[in-house]
Amino acid sequence: MHSKARWEEATLPYELATEVPFDTYVERTDKYNIHGWWEWENGTVRVIEFPTKFHERCVGGIVDEIAIATRTVKSTNLGILNDGSTTTKTPRTGKESDNSWTPVAKPRLIRGGCDRSGTQPWPNLVIEIAYSQSEADVKRKVETYWLQAGRAHDAIAIKIEEPVAPATRPSVMTAWHYCINHPRTATGAFNPTRYEFGTIDSRNGNQINLQPGQCVINIQLACLYHGVPANVLNPPPPPPPQLPPPNLFATLPNPIPIDMFHVQFAMLNN
């Protein structure tokens, strides 16, 4: 890390270094295992978030929800791959999400993909979580990077408000679900669906006693499997006298539910 970085005084995003080759950025990211904490743009590396227990448990809670919902297609051609905080690359920028998911059967590309070769397909779902980072910054990253044309289909942005002493746990936690199919505002801006899953509603200060099933983010299968060939989702029947295999796609819930009660529980306990 930069010898002059004073993290206790830092305001995010924090410019760490300039004139850094992208390969060096990737090498350091892997070496220090800090995927998702910094990003690269035109040779400049900026720290955008600090690791915290609440941040990591929020990621883990959402990962668990998706894994449970898609368990019937695990290790099949209909599986959903957990890409974690894999580095993505465009001509000018390199960024990682806090987590992302890509269908096994989503085809590779000739150009415009999310890796240096341009052939790796973009994930269909990404999550971005801000704790030290501001709400405006995390939304900007989602809207100006992940949801650009040909990239992710759905994204979840989350802002966890840092607790104010003497509190030791956050009470205000807000999520926004973006989907490129959602109607935009009259001015063309994104119009994500908002969810309050903390213990206090950020809009009015009211207490929230969250219960299972009360705050659920729904991901449509058509969105999660965007770009997957139709013959993979609904394979043609074999010639007689063979019997058609079980339709695994039909075993999936539609929509895929992400119950934020369980995410809140993981964040605020122990």
Protein language model annotation of sequence segments:
Residues 1-270:
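Gly/Pro/Ser/Thr-rich low-complexity, intrinsically disordered segments predominantly at protein N-termini
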